[in-house]
């Protein structure tokens, strides 16, 4: 990690209790916008181990190209390098875009480990609702908490870079944890068992232990806000 990226990481990372809440790393300029990595830890039962208010420190990095663009780039090898600076191990990743009119588009991308190796297609399941982004709950627990987390992540960015019309209630992406497939649940369970055998605790140190949400930030004049969501 370069000195500049390390300084940024140190300046915006925070801890709440014993949980590492987020570690935002400014990555290389690639395509239309600067990519900002945000590493969020959630507990296994789906509850949030921190207050959503603790996400207020999130920062946008100004894009030089002033547009997120309307195409969804692939997960190439250079972008996978962000895994090495964030501690990600293996997650299913989804590119998604949210338009100002509230509609959503989602494209599945291969899940990768920190070396860029692909996991089975069976792990790739839609986790974001297509169509209108409505009905996000303000609850901070369980499935609704995950919807609210994505909602608040976008809302936290808006005062910095987004048009005023994108408010906390106007664009609400949905994260449907209930749609996570059986193979994914089995994968999670096997990781937990493996970790419990090694450590006597379910800490998931070596297998899918944290969620990584790198946000591709659009300019205020762009029609799009693009983001990636990683779900276990």
UniProtKB/Swiss-Prot annotation:
Briefly state the protein's biological role. Answer: Oxidoreductase; part of the gene cluster that mediates the biosynthesis of elsinochromes, pigments consisting of at least four interconvertible tautomers (A, B, C and D) that have a core phenolic quinone to which various side chains are attached and which play an important role in fungal pathogenesis. The non-reducing polyketide synthase PKS1 was proposed to iteratively catalyze decarboxylation between acetyl-CoA and malonyl-CoA subunits for polyketide chain elongation.
Tell me the GO molecular function terms: oxidoreductase activity
Q: What protein am I looking at? A: Oxidoreductase 1
What keywords tag this UniProt record? FAD, Flavoprotein, Oxidoreductase
Q: Which gene encodes it?
A: OXR1
What family does this chain come from, according to its entry?
Belongs to the MQO family.
Disulfide partners:
none
- Which species is this record about? Elsinoe fawcettii
Which enzyme type, at the first EC level?
Answer: oxidoreductase
| Needed co-factor(s) | FAD
Q: Which domain of life is it from?
A: Eukaryota
Give the EC number(s) listed in the UniProt record. 1.1.-.-
Q: Do you know what upregulates this one?
A: Expression is up-regulated in the presence of large amounts of glucose and during nitrogen starvation, conditions highly conducive to elsinochrome accumulation.
